[in-house]
Amino acid sequence: AAKAMFSREGFDLANFREELLEKGKDSSLQTIRDEIIGMNIFNSVFVDCTASADIASLYKDFLQHNISVVAANKIAAYETYRELKTIARQRGVKYLFETNVGAGLPIINTINDLIHSGDKILKIEAVLSGTLNYIFNKISADIPFSRTIKMAQEERYSEPDPRIDLSGKDVIRKLVILAREAGYKLEQEDVEKNLFVPNDFFEGSLDDFWKR
């Protein structure tokens, strides 16, 4: 089982891995929720660097308990976007997700500044997938497509499951996030996509995908 540690005093980063193994308790979503809310630390911020839908499901509860959320995780920003933004505004806390698009470049913040100054965003042009950009730059007569996918994962360009990138899901998530921040009411189903990988490659498990 996954381990977790909680402390109001913080941790010594020089040996936190050893401490986690020795003193960490078995972790669950309920444990994480209860420990963080129970600490009741003023002006606290929950930072999510995972790609977990389960962790993203905790945001609403945290925001309702006056805990700000900063997320690299894209899932909540396209699934429960309006609800979380509304709760954060009502509770006077922050729900921020700048790294969802552009790897931390101030794209979302810039859009917010433009909108708040009265501008209307009409068009955005961007390369939104570092993974696909990497793959298309690497593929050649000497390096087959399958190898470039593996290279992208080894170099940590891709999502843990590269099919999320290849299916266009990651790009669609980013497009929806940007459109919503620009003031448009958009859902994933509104985005047109043209796949360059056959649909049957997305069926089955991740292990099945790598065997093809």
Segments predicted by a language model, with ranges:
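Hydrophobic residues within beta-strands of alpha/beta enzymes
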Residues: 69-70, 124
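Rossmann-like NAD(P)H-binding beta-loop-alpha module
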Residues: 89-92, 96-155, 169, 177
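A generic structural signal for short
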Residues: 46-48, 72-73, 136-137, 164
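N-terminal glycine-/serine-/threonine-rich beta1-alpha1-beta2 phosphate-ribose binding loop
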Residues: 1-64
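Substrate-binding/catalytic subdomain of NAD(P)-dependent oxidoreductase enzymes
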Residues: 138-139, 147-212
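Rossmann-fold NAD(P)-binding glycine/threonine-rich loop
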Residues: 50-65, 72-114
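Short, surface-exposed amphipathic charged segments that create phosphate/polyanion-binding patches used
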Residues: 9-14, 110-113, 174
